[in-house]
Amino acid sequence: VDRAICDSCEGKECIRQHDTKGMYLSYKEETVEAVIGEACANEMMFYDGGGVTFTGGEATVQFQELKDALKGLKEKDIHTAIETNGTHPSLPELFPYIGQLIMDCKHCDASKHQRYTGISNERIMENIRRAAKEHPKLHVRVPLIGGFNDSEPELEQFLDFFREIKGDNVTFEVLSYHEFGKKKWQQCGWEYKMTDEARVDEASVRRFRKAMEESGVRYRRT
């Protein structure tokens, strides 16, 4: 969005007429069949362990299309992976069609998760627990954010939960906070409210990683 143009525009005609004078679309519509076809056409380039990864945004927002694509790719013997925030109530329906399931675990405390993200973590925790029991290859990631989930008590909460769900099929990882989405917020004309306090140093990441490894869970860097 070009605010210099759009803020003074009253009719917003470009939205209906696809006029890109001040606003443009940053996506491309594709059919499920086209996605599967492109994957098949490029299969020779996948080499060892290659395939198709669905990420976001949040891929499960388009749940039925995602499910159809995953099923179609599985029928073609093409490996699939999905990165998800774990909030969709029907996520377990996708488990049979996903080769690698990657889920975020931002916080173990329901009230703090609600306060900072706007939604409860109950569905997320439930889906992670189910995935740990039902999916053959689950990778759980903690995006470490200063002032939100990087304290010692919060580390202990993570460790308690991870020990509960650990198994040969489950791996864990800590990721440093980043600002990859900042530009997207600015392009949409939204205020990016995260401050420098959200950044964590490498020592904090190492502290979490060391504690996880010593607790007996399988740590894996991606």
Write out the residue ranges for each language-model feature.
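Short glycine/proline- and charge-enriched loop/turn segments
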Residues: Q187-M194
